[in-house]
């Protein structure tokens, strides 16, 4: 009798993706974040679905509907905070996943990498629109400030902003369309994830050494399924500690005040996971320049395959590049901190220096060091 797992048209796809998939024998815990991101996406879609059952996307009732979810719906508070903090866990896993890709040279699979960058943009767009939905002060003013940046686009900017708003200001039309987009985007993300995996399975996974591992492969199940389950348990542990002990730790107190177009909050800032990009945006005095820097801060990831100058793929055996990589990580932490600070001395200058350093390391220092390391090894 033939095994249904290997013959059934649908089940064999799952089999080739998660069971009989040949995987390198030496991939470390850094390779767990792909599956963790998948779990995060599932959590977000499920909690989001249940929230959408009780949420109303109308300026008059949006804030009250969120309060109603937290007070009156069975375990509504749990669903709401799992969704809000699930987004933070999603971004933590995303940043670590991208960082792993940079460190171990996974960007040389450039189709997989570029789809990944598009996914990052899609997740950021989804998170931004989701933050607008509770219709608190920071929701309203965040939406106003960020959408207003598009007015910096020459010629069509002002028209574009009014078109996105659906009126003269952020209002009912804006909230309704943001809810519609926030609902549809995760499903588009799911489709992109499938494309991401399809491209990855064309080449197989990279590994810490960056060397070809075709001669030493092991089946994904049971080795990496059990390893992924451990990762998922740890992810759920951290998420539930956050949700049950300090659900508002990463949120903004201003968002517990209903949106008021007549009263601007003293410090408008996005959620923590956007602060590094927000700091880069603010460090350039020109509006259009700031918007370009903001977009390029993420888009620059697509240049990594072109800027790879080393004869080795991974940074595992390249101490100078490793050193520069960790300086880049420290720089991103600095930018995140600056993004949450008011626009005044000394934060302005620190932000500007950190922004310059960010682009310098990626565009100039890392490729130069890679060439220097090739010379040291007489390659």
UniProtKB/Swiss-Prot annotation:
Its cofactor is heme b. InterPro entries: Cyt_b/b6_C (IPR005798), Cyt_b/b6_C_sf (IPR036150), Cyt_b/b6_N (IPR005797), Cytb/b6-like_sf (IPR027387), Cytochrome_b (IPR030689), Cytochrome_b_C_euk/bac (IPR048260), Cytochrome_b_N_euk/bac (IPR048259), Di-haem_cyt_TM (IPR016174). Heme b b562 binds at residues 83, 182. One of its GO terms (cellular component) is respiratory chain complex III. It is a multi-pass membrane protein. Heme b b566 binds at residues 97, 196. The keyword Repressor does not apply. The keyword Heme applies. Binds 2 heme b groups non-covalently. It is found in: Mitochondrion inner membrane. It comes from the Eukaryota. CDD domains: cytochrome_b_C, Cytochrome_b_N. PROSITE patterns: CYTB_CTER, CYTB_NTER. GO terms for biological process: mitochondrial electron transport, ubiquinol to cytochrome c. One of its GO terms (molecular function) is ubiquinol-cytochrome-c reductase activity. Keywords: Electron transport, Heme, Iron, Membrane, Metal-binding, Mitochondrion, Mitochondrion inner membrane, Respiratory chain, Transmembrane, Transmembrane helix, Transport, Ubiquinone. A ubiquinone binds at residue 201. Gene3D superfamilies: Cytochrome Bc1 Complex, Chain C. Heme 1 (or BL or b562) is low-potential and absorbs at about 562 nm, and heme 2 (or BH or b566) is high-potential and absorbs at about 566 nm. The cytochrome bc1 complex contains 11 subunits: 3 respiratory subunits (MT-CYB, CYC1 and UQCRFS1), 2 core proteins (UQCRC1 and UQCRC2) and 6 low-molecular weight proteins (UQCRH/QCR6, UQCRB/QCR7, UQCRQ/QCR8, UQCR10/QCR9, UQCR11/QCR10 and a cleavage product of UQCRFS1). This cytochrome bc1 complex then forms a dimer. Belongs to the cytochrome b family. Component of the ubiquinol-cytochrome c reductase complex (complex III or cytochrome b-c1 complex) that is part of the mitochondrial respiratory chain. The b-c1 complex mediates electron transfer from ubiquinol to cytochrome c. Contributes to the generation of a proton gradient across the mitochondrial membrane that is then used for ATP synthesis. This is Cytochrome b. The gene is MT-CYB.
């Amino acid at each position: 009798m033939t095994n249904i797992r290997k013959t059934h048209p649908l089940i064999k796809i799952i089999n080739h993706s998660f069971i009989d998939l040949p995987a390198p024998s030496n991939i470390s815990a850094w390779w767990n974040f792909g599956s963790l991101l998948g779990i995060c996406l599932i959590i977000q879609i499920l909690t989001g679905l249940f929230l959408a059952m009780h949420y109303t996307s109308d300026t008059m009732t949006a804030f009250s509907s969120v309060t109603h979810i937290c007070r009156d719906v069975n375990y509504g508070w749990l669903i709401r905070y799992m969704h809000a903090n699930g987004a933070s866990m999603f971004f933590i896993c995303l940043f670590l996943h991208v960082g792993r890709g940079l460190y171990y040279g996974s960007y040389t699979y450039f189709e997989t990498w570029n789809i990944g960058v598009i996914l990052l943009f899609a997740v950021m767009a989804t998170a931004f629109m989701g933050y607008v939905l509770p219709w608190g002060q920071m929701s309203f003013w965040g939406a106003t400030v960020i959408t207003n940046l598009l007015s910096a686009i020459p010629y069509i900017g002002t028209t574009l902003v009014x078109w996105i708003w659906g009126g003269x200001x952020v209002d009912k039309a804006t909230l309704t369309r943001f809810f519609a987009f926030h609902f549809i985007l995760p499903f588009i993300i799911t489709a992109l994830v499938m494309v991401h995996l399809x491209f990855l399975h064309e080449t197989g996974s990279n590994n810490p050494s960056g060397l070809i591992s075709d001669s030493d492969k092991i089946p994904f199940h049971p080795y990496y399924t059990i390893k992924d389950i451990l990762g998922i348990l740890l992810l759920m542990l951290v998420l539930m500690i956050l949700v049950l002990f300090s659900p508002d730790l990463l949120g903004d107190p201003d968002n517990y005040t209903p949106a008021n177009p007549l009263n601007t909050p003293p410090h408008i800032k996005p959620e923590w996971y956007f602060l590094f990009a927000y700091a880069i945006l603010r460090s350039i005095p020109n509006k259009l320049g700031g918007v370009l820097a903001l977009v390029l801060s993420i888009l620059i990831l697509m240049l990594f395959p072109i800027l790879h100058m080393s004869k080795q793929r991974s940074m595992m055996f390249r101490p100078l590049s490793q050193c520069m990589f960790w300086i880049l990580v420290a720089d991103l932490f600095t930018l995140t901190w600056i993004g949450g600070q008011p626009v005044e001395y000394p934060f302005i200058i620190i932000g500007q220096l950190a922004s310059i350093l960010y682009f310098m390391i990626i565009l100039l220092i890392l490729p130069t060091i890679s060439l220097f390391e090739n010379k040291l090894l007489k390659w």
